[in-house]
Amino acid sequence: MYWYRDGNLLSLLPWLAAMAAVWLGGWLLATHAFRLQARERLIVGLALGLVLYTWLANLLGHWLSPDLTFTLPALLLLLVGGLLAWRRKEGPWLDRGDLKIWPWLLAGLGLIYVFLLWSKGLTLFDEHKNLSLISIMGNGDIPPHFLPNYPLNFIYHYGFHFIGASLMRLGGLLPWSAFDASKALLWGLMLLLAGLLGRRYVGRAWGGWATAAVVALAAGTRYLLLLLPPGFLLQADKVVQLQGTSALIGKPFSQALSSPWPVDGGPPLPYMFGFLNGIMDPMVMAHQGPNIFAVLILLLVWFLIPRLSGRWSFLLLAAIFSTWALAWETTYALFLMGMVAFSAITYWRRGNTDLPQFKPVLAAAALSLPIALVQGGTLTELARDFVFGIQGPGLLQSAGAWISILTPARVLKGTFDVLGFSLRWPPAILSAHLGALSLFSPVQLIVGLFELGPIILFTPYITRWAWRRAQAGDWLLGVLASSAWLGLLVPVFFQYQSDRDISRLSWQALLIWTILLVFVVADRSFGWRAWLRHSAKAALGLMVFGGLVIAGTQFSAAATTRLGDGYNELDAAIAAKLWGRLPEEAKVFGPMRSTTVLTGHLSGQLLDKPGPSDVWHTLMAAPMLDLLISERYDFAYIDSRVWEDLSLEVRNAAGLDAVCVQTLAEVWDNSHVNFRRMLDLRSCP
């Protein structure tokens, strides 16, 4: 049971109907609110519809039932699109010529299928967190809580998870199939947008496919370190320390480059560490999900801003920006910072910011800020904690941190943190796998440059090209170039309380520069010498090669199916009986990881285990009925893998066979040895 809770393919029909309405509504909006070309409207309409569907579902989910939360946004999109088409009163509502893009749609289906095959065979990257979010959001916990009945919601960018949650609620899917299908859908659509964007800038079909290939495959070039003299790599062993999961390789850096990466849930043919990257992994490896959605929104914004048409496009753009904040606040903030930086530079050089459509876009971005602070997600919860002090003293202490900005930098260092940021000294290139690589250490600097990839050598030319195009009217390129520079430099000079998290800023910078380099290479009017143009092509080829190796590695997982990390057919069977059927106010005991995922009901702390003093640990070691009742649990979930690990004395003394205990649901394997069981304790005094 990988796909459906009831095993019936027809269960998907309500979701397909909702998505048809989303696509049709998005197509209408793309046609009548923006000045798009015929070959762009259908695909951009699907992306626009999905992004706005996510935003509406998040807003409605605060108050409405799960069924309405995931159904009503589709109808609203269709209604708004129809009203906008009716108000225009000129030309057809939709142009049948838009359907000539059908070969691209077939290519998109192929891309979705390939990524789905990879995802079905892999259980990588925050699997528990993603499955839990999809499950509880599909069951109506919006915004998702961190603990049951706890005032602080989960601090996370959960926008991506609405697509998977809709597949569970409307499509009858299980958590793992909903997760994999939502990733695959957005990944394929993301590459179609990249292809259309490349087609627009290059003016030829090959430009579209080249841009899509770069977005999918481009990565850092750590593997090129293997070409350096052995003596250099031995020097690197002394100053480069592996971080996180990479440290489990247990070898010096020089040997780790040609070693498998020991990650749980990886493909049968393991990833080679030398082809991975701690700054820019290829998008073929984007199995966590939110980064796919963030790139899709970036490309959508890139598409729509030059094609605004009236107040409706302004309002829709504000909603898209707000969804971006919900999908990945880091890249959203980086784009806004790029707008501010570009505005300042333009005003300084020209004395004004009179550029086509610049002020409406700036207003849409400004409108999205207060929405982002109240709609839910990371920014909302950080703002709530800052003001109300749910996890600390609140505004008073936080305000003190802001005052510290006015003090000299040498006093700041090691004394104050501002919103989790502090100065980094010495400056360094930050890699999630290799840590901070100091700019003042020649060996670390060289390793860091290879980690970034050869794109870094072409940034002056990319910036010059983008700025010239910006001054000629395509100012969005100037904003993107500015945000890319900020994304590179902020992690170099500032560190964060969770330092590896801000490596995402550098990832965004490298992605933007790589896309722009494709456009620069294709622009024959740009004054490059021939050897520079050929060198840029070679640099793109070297960055794409690493992604090709990763993609080839993942094909070894295409023939396998994994339900989820640690889940099997019994878990799927009990989920079919339990998901969405427990009372909303019920308190449920069980292994926090599986109980939440399989029932859609938050059974405890969403991420990680509770502190050692929590009674949950006592109950897991000895689930005594009297203690469960005294802790006001209504249900107890029993997994035979956990139950059999208890001593016979504990099992006999637990009292879970009392008359008052009823079995709500139970499944066994064919050997009648392994089981999953949900016990109803509500009748016990």
Write out the residue ranges for each language-model feature.
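Membrane-embedded, hydrophobic transmembrane alpha-helices
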Residues: 1-95, 483
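Membrane-helix boundary/interfacial segments in multi-pass membrane proteins
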Residues: 13, 62-67, 122-127, 151, ...
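Start-transfer (signal-anchor) and selected internal transmembrane alpha helices
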Residues: 64-116, 205-212, 359-363, 539, ...
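Membrane-interface helix-loop-helix junctions at transmembrane boundaries of multi-pass membrane enzymes
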Residues: 91-100, 306-313, 348-361, 457-484, ...
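Transmembrane alpha-helix segments characteristic
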Residues: 104-108, 313-323, 362-365, 467-494, ...
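Active-site lumenal/periplasmic loops and adjacent helix-entry segments of GT-C-fold
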Residues: 109-297, 561-565
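Hydrophobic/aromatic-rich transmembrane helices and adjacent perimembrane loops
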Residues: 184-188, 289, 333-339, 497-528
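Extracytoplasmic
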Residues: 470, 523-685
